[in-house]
Amino acid sequence: MQCGLVGKIIKRFEQKGFRLVAMKFLPASEEHLKQHYIDLKDRPFFPGLVKYMNSGPVVAMVWEGLNVVKTGRVMLGETNPADSKPGTIRGDFCIQVGRNIIHGSDSVKSAEKEISLRFKPEELVDYKSCAHDWVYE
């Protein structure tokens, strides 16, 4: 959020044909971050991750579309921006692994869990994009 890249990131997902179904701008509490990143709690970088993520607001988004988790991970690039190719979000906008600006779920199961931490089911908007028939068979 602090980098002023929200619009550019949204644009990339929309251009790919994905559909934004929920979005919130909110603070990331330490409690929520510890729950969200619970699988990393024993890693040495965990305290720094929580501190960094707690330093300002975040924009939480839910995207839908064919293979959105898998394709989204490719669009994000590698966790370490130095290993990310140009054209990926991290390859274009990041320089340090601890400040890689964006999180993407690593599986559908993780996505479902992470979505439930931030959104109620009724907050996910179901609609048909006017571009749907141009993107999908």
Curated annotation (Swiss-Prot):
Pfam families in the cross-refs: NDK
Protein function: Major role in the synthesis of nucleoside triphosphates other than ATP. The ATP gamma phosphate is transferred to the NDP beta phosphate via a ping-pong mechanism, using a phosphorylated active-site intermediate.
UniProt-recorded Gene Ontology molecular function terms: ATP binding; metal ion binding; nucleoside diphosphate kinase activity
Signal sequence coordinates: none
Cofactors required: Mg(2+)
Listed NCBIfam families: PRK00668.1
Stated name of the protein: Putative nucleoside diphosphate kinase
Entry keyword annotation includes Transcription regulation: no
Positions that bind ATP: F45, R73, T79, R90, N100
Recorded GO CC terms: extracellular exosome; nucleus
Keywords for this protein: ATP-binding, Kinase, Magnesium, Metal-binding, Nucleotide metabolism, Nucleotide-binding, Transferase
